[in-house]
Amino acid sequence: MTLLALVWLLLDATFLITLLWHLLQGCKSGHSLLCSVFQDLIRYGKTKTGLQRPAWLQWFDIPKRCFWHFYCVSLIWNGCLLWILLRLLLQSVPVPEWLQLVLHFLHAGSEPQILDRELSVILALALLWLHSLRRLLECLFVSVFSNGVIHLVQYCFGLGYYFLIGITVLTYCPLDRRTVSTDNLLTQCHWYHILGLALYIWASLHQYRCHCILAGLRKSASGNVINLNHSVPCGDWFERVSCPHYFAELLIYVSIAVVFGLLNTIWWLVVLYVLLNQALAALLCHEFYHEKFDTYPIHRKAFIPFIF
C-alpha cells in the first residue's frame, strides 16, 4: 500500500469514527474539556451556535467567509498541475524534479501505471479546476456569509486537502511518457468520459442553484443583503434534503470517478472521504434546523434523498 492510499484510508477511518460517535450521542451533551474540543473541531458556521466553548478555544476561530481561500489555493495549485501535465504530454517538457520527488514519496511501491489513461487524468484535473473556479466565484459574488467561524485546524486541513487531491489525480497515469498525440487522446475517449461529464454538469448546476437559494434568503429582490439570519431554504433539492449542496458535492466527486472509468481505486477512497465528511456536516446542519425551527419539514433527510 502506498503512503497516499494510507493517508486517505486514515482520513476515511477518522471521519467514519467521528460520524458514528456523533450518531451514538458521544460527547453531545458532555461538558468535559475533551468533549468541548471534539465539538469545536467537527462543527463550523451555524452549527457552532449555542455551543458552550471555553474562551481559549475562540483564539483558534477564523471567519467562515475565508472559505474562498481554499478554492483560490486549489485554482492555482491544480491549474499548475494541469499545465505541467499538458506540457509533458503535448510538448515533451519534463515534469519538474520537485514534483517527481513528491509523487515518488507519496506513491512509491504502487503497481506500474497503465498507458492510455492520459485523457482521464486531463479531464479529472480540468473538472477539479473548473469546480474550484465556480466555487471561488460563488464565495466572492453569490454567497452571503454570516459571522460564523471555522477552527484553525479545519482551515489548515482544507488547504492541505486541495493539495492532496491534485496529487492523487496525477498518480493515475505514468509521467515518464514524453508525448501523446491529439489523435491518441481521441482514441482514449470512452462512454464513461461522456457519462462522467454529464453527471458533473448536472450536479454542478444543482449545487449552484442551491447556493443561490441560500444566498437569496439574506437578500432582497434587488440583490442587496438585508439580513444575516438563518431561515428555512426551499426549492430545488431542498425539498428532499436539508443540505443538497453537500449531496451535489458528493455527486461531483462520483462523476470524476466515472471519468476514471470507475477503476481508480485511490479515487474511490477520496469519494468515501467526501461521503463521510459531507454526511457529518449535513447531519449537524440538519440537527440545527430541527432545533431552531419547530415547523421544519419532517420528511426532509439530512444528506441523501430518501436514505440519510
Swiss-Prot record:
GO cellular component, as recorded: endoplasmic reticulum; endoplasmic reticulum membrane
Catalysed reactions listed for this entry: a di-trans,poly-cis-dolichal + NADP(+) = a di-trans,poly-cis-polyprenal + NADPH + H(+); a 3-oxo-5alpha-steroid + NADP(+) = a 3-oxo-Delta(4)-steroid + NADPH + H(+); androst-4-ene-3,17-dione + NADPH + H(+) = 5alpha-androstan-3,17-dione + NADP(+); 17beta-hydroxy-5alpha-androstan-3-one + NADP(+) = testosterone + NADPH + H(+)
Cellular localization per UniProt: Endoplasmic reticulum membrane
PROSITE patterns attached to this UniProt entry: S5A_REDUCTASE (PS50244)
Keywords annotated in UniProt: Endoplasmic reticulum, Lipid metabolism, Membrane, NADP, Oxidoreductase, Transmembrane, Transmembrane helix
Pathway assignment: Protein modification; protein glycosylation
Broadest EC class assigned to this enzyme: oxidoreductase
Residue ranges that the UniProt entry lists as topological domain Cytoplasmic: 1-2, 87-120, 170-184, 277-308
Membrane topology: Multi-pass membrane protein
Domain of life: Eukaryota
Major localization class: endoplasmic reticulum
GO biological process per UniProt: dolichol biosynthetic process; dolichol metabolic process; dolichol-linked oligosaccharide biosynthetic process; polyprenol catabolic process
Lumenal side, ranges: 24-65, 142-148, 206-255
Stretch forming the signal peptide: none
Function: Plays a key role in early steps of protein N-linked glycosylation by being involved in the conversion of polyprenol into dolichol. Acts as a polyprenal reductase that mediates the reduction of polyprenal into dolichal in a NADP-dependent mechanism. Dolichols are required for the synthesis of dolichol-linked monosaccharides and the oligosaccharide precursor used for N-glycosylation. Also able to convert testosterone (T) into 5-alpha-dihydrotestosterone (DHT).
Similarity-based family: Belongs to the steroid 5-alpha reductase family. Polyprenal reductase subfamily.
Protein name per its UniProtKB record: Polyprenal reductase
Lineage, opening ranks: Eukaryota, Metazoa, Chordata, Craniata, Vertebrata
